[in-house]
From Swiss-Prot:
Protein name: Flagellar P-ring protein
Keywords, comma-separated and alphabetical: Bacterial flagellum, Periplasm, Signal
Alphabetical list of InterPro entries matching this protein: Flag_FlgI (IPR001782)
Biological process terms in GO annotation: bacterial-type flagellum-dependent cell motility
UniProt function note: Assembles around the rod to form the L-ring and probably protects the motor/basal body from shearing forces during rotation.
Compartments in which it is found: Periplasm; Bacterial flagellum basal body
GO molecular function: structural molecule activity
Subunit description: The basal body constitutes a major portion of the flagellar organelle and consists of four rings (L,P,S, and M) mounted on a central rod.
Classification via Pfam families: FlgI
Gene transcribed to yield this protein: flgI
Amino acid sequence: MVIKFLSALILLLVTTAAQAERIRDLTSVQGVRQNSLIGYGLVVGLDGTGDQTTQTPFTTQTLNNMLSQLGITVPTGTNMQLKNVAAVMVTASLPPFGRQGQTIDVVVSSMGNAKSLRGGTLLMTPLKGVDSQVYALAQGNILVGGAGASAGGSSVQVNQLNGGRITNGAVIERELPSQFGVGNTLNLQLNDEDFSMAQQIADTINRVRGYGSATALDARAIQVRVPSGNSSQVRFLADIQNMQVNVTPQDAKVVINSRTGSVVMNREVTLDSCAVAQGNLSVTVNRQANVSQPDTPFGGGQTVVTPQTQIDLRQSGGSLQSVRSSASLNNVVRALNALGATPMDLMSILQSMQSAGCLRAKLEII
């Protein structure tokens, strides 16, 4: 009897520990976020895969402006047909608390009709924020993840060649002003809105830090009273973020990607008993050109092309199949696989099942 009790207790503790997560994994601090940066620049050193300057006048204009700043004057009316230069857009994210001299990654994307950025070098490009202030300078060799080759009118390409990345390719030159440490309250934002989780996090903080330390404002935000000063708030948040809370069950959800046909569901999805009839209707149109020539060579007839079209209509399936009630994800998968439907068919089946009240989950189409 004692052994059974200890076994049940150990199982309960393991289950509880497996469901506990740190507050830092469930929330973020309001105001502590990344900021987007953007810039326009030139990539040089391409192996004949750059912009066709006759079709992208902005590339030539940018090159002339850059040469003018370097003290080189290009005669007016000069038609520079270069193939190793490309105009690009450069994007980056300025991390929270980014300091001067810190390096960040940048993404380089072709703006014109360049065939590839492989082997290119990004020239010094200022990166600006929404306030038009320069916060970083980007420059460096571009790493392109794709590969390609062409010869004799044929080409082979693997992955994308018109975009690349420069690791640590930008240096922060200006710091963003921060309001961290000002005031006596901070808001923790849940990654996913959940009233019960917000209240549970507030209760956990109040249990450790005292009643009134945290208040759940809504399903997304928890207001926390913090001491004043940067160092005090850093220590306070470090303690709070490492607190563990028991994660409540997720909302049952099915996510459908209408472009790729992929269907993803979490473990909370359940099915009620229902009957499904699913049929496939396919239409095949085949058009073939027939050449009709006159039988006699000198009869005055003409050779004409007559199109011949064949249409084939087929319908398969349509039998009524029973779907049993399923309370676990494995049983849901087995029940849906028993229908023998493709992912594209499964999207419409799940929509119909939700309309009939048989799918106990939220259906999200992206």
